[in-house]
Each structure stands twice: as C-alpha cells, then as structure tokens.
Regions:
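Generic detector of well-ordered alpha-helical packing
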Residues: 168-170, 216, 273
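Conserved catalytic-core segment of NTP-binding enzymes
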Residues: 178, 185, 194-205, 211, ...
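Primarily NTPase-proximal linker/entry elements flanking Walker-type ATP/GTP-binding cores
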Residues: 22-163, 167-170, 181-182, 186-196
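Generic beta-sheet signal
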Residues: 132-134, 163, 210-214, 242
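Glycine-rich beta-strand-to-loop/alpha-helix junction loops that act as flexible
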Residues: 137-138, 215-217
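Post-nucleotide-binding-loop coupling segment downstream of the phosphate-binding loop, primarily
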Residues: 170, 175-176
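Asparagine/serine/threonine-enriched low-complexity, disordered tracts
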Residues: 1-10, 16-28
C-alpha cells in the first residue's frame, strides 16, 4: 500500500521538490557561523604549526627569511649556534614581525644583546700610596710581551706615570731582549728574575713606582709542571691584577679550554690580535660564561698605538666586524 503520487509521497523517491521542507534562514546562518568558527579554528591551528616549525627551524639553524641573513652573518663572525639562537630569539621578542625586514631595528636588537654580554670591562688604575702590581699570564704565542710593552709605553709616555718592568720569562731569550729594548726606548727600568723569591725582591725595589708590570713565560695549559711554576711566581708576587692574555684568533673551543686552566689565577682578561681574525665573535661565548672583566684589546703590532681600553661598545663593534 502506498499513497498516490498526487499526494506527494513516493517511498522509493522521497518528497517531490515542491513539497520539500525548506530550511529557515536562521538555520542557514547558524550553519555558516559554525563553518566560520571551524575555519577560524583551522587558521589558528595552522598559525600555531607555522610558529612551531619556525622554532624548530631556528634550533636547526634555519630562520624566517628576514632573519636568516642575520643568522648567516653572525655565523660568519664566529658566534656559536647557541648564541645565535639566543640573539635572534630576542629579536623576535623585541621587534614586531612586520619590522623584521628593517635592518636597523634588527641590528639594534642584536647589538643591545651583545653589548649586555660585553658589559663587564675594567682598565688598569695606577697605584696611589704604593705601586699597582700587574702580572700578565697566558699560553705561548699570544703576544704577552708586546702587550706589556704597549701598556708600559702608554702609561709612562702618554700618562707620565712611574713604571717598572719585570720579566720572569727566562725560557725565551728573545722575550727578555725585547722587553729590555722596550725599556730603553721609553726610559723604563727592566729587571730579569729567575726565581719566585727574586721576583718578590725585585718588586720590593720598585716601591716608588705607580705601576709594576710582570711578564711571565708562556705556559701550556696542558702542562701541569709549567702551571705549578707559574703559580709559584704569582704566590710570591701577590699581584693586584692578574691578566689572562688570549688571542682573539683562537678557536672558541680552545679559548674555553685555556680559560678553564687559567681562570683560578685570573682577575682580568686581555684579547690580542683582534686585527688578525674575521671571526671576532669567537670571544663572545667566553664572555657570556665569565664574570671576569675585559681590560684591553690589541689590534696590531705598533707600540704603543695598537692597544685600546675595552668598553662594551668597542667589543661589540669588533665582534660584529664594524671596525673593518
């Protein structure tokens, strides 16, 4: 049994179109709202996925296009991947995404972060009632003797201070001769000592000076006997400042090892040969991990010109290659 077709119902075909129940407009609007909400939810999900992908890319050394050029530049300057990540994460926090193509804004953010890492600086101050005793230590070949010559010339000739030089570097005759020559040229007394006790006596003879610089033999950080000898000299000298001299042209991993071996003897840092590397950023990882201040940087062989008091701005410029 079935209704006749004229009554509008065929079980096998359903209602005729003219008899079909049409949805109310409010129902259509509700369906559209649901679809729009679903699209908005999908859009947010995609944005979140993009952010996660960008984060993963940053960890793997790949960044959004406007920041990738900065990642490449920082890498070329010898800055570690970990620090690059930190610097660019700070950019993402401080600079709106639409401003990332603005080189000045991005550079300002990066410079600000690097300046903060380089904020610990302190130069030598001459003694007042007694001489300030300054010892320079470090591995071989980093330019300790030349650095002492620059410091002595600067303080004696430019600042008119009373200065004495003492060398305990008896391993290298050339170093002794070099320091004696410096002394003769700038009119500063130079003493050569062979033992820790004679070093103490030499310091006592120059109590009328404002500054006494001590040149020590270059020591291999891996040679325990050499390190023991250095400690013996420093124990007798009791310097007010002990400056660890390191070459900025040294690879970051080697800088870290040198620092670890000398750190317990050190009060200040000096970086030499800043002019001999295009990877000035190698020192940044070390500065990030130490509380020791940087006193001086050197950028050539000329005495006394090629030495500068370290400042956060000056270090930042060298690290970013802005001194070239």
């Amino acid at each position: 049994f079935s209704l006749k077709p004229e009554y509008g119902h065929k079980p096998e075909y359903g209602l005729k179109p003219e008899y079909a129940i049409k949805p109310e407009p409010s129902v259509k609007n509700a369906e559209i709202s649901v679809l729009e909400a679903e699209l908005q939810s999908m859009r947010k999900l995609l944005e979140s996925m993009n952010r996660q992908m960008e984060k993963l890319d940053g960890e793997q050394g790949v960044w959004p296009v406007p920041l990738q050029k900065w990642a490449d530049l920082l890498r070329e300057r010898g800055i570690s991947p970990q620090l690059i990540k930190r610097l660019l994460r700070t950019v993402q926090q401080e600079v709106r995404e639409e401003d990332w193509p603005d080189e000045e804004r991005v550079r300002a953010s990066i410079r600000g972060s690097i300046r903060q890492i380089c904020s610990k600086t302190a130069a030598i101050q001459p003694g007042v009632l007694k001489p300030r005793v300054v010892a320079l230590i470090g591995p071989t070949g980093v330019g300790k003797t030349t650095t002492i010559g620059k410091l002595a010339a600067g303080f004696s000739i430019v600042d008119k201070r009373r200065v004495a030089l003492i060398t305990a570097d008896t391993y290298r005759v050339a170093a002794v001769d070099q320091l004696k020559t410096f002394g003769e040229i700038i009119g500063v007394p130079v003493e050569v000592v062979m033992t820790p006790s004679s070093l103490k006596e030499a310091i006592a003879r120059h109590q009328d000076k404002e500054l006494i610089f001590i040149d020590t033999a270059g020591r291999s950080p891996h040679h325990e006997l050499h390190m023991s000898e250095l400690r013996a000299f420093l124990e007798k000298a009791q310097p007010d400042l002990t400056m660890l001299v390191m070459s900025a042209a040294t690879q970051a991993a080697d800088l870290a090892k040198i620092y670890e071996r000398f750190a317990n003897l050190t009060t200040h840092l000096v970086f030499t040969k800043m002019d001999e590397t295009v990877c000035g950023g190698t020192i940044l990882s070390l500065l990030d991990r130490t509380e020791l201040p940087v006193a001086y940087i050197t950028n050539g062989q000329n005495v006394p010109d090629d030495i500068e008091v370290a400042t956060p701005e000056r270090l930042t410029r060298y690290i970013l290659g802005e001194e070239d």
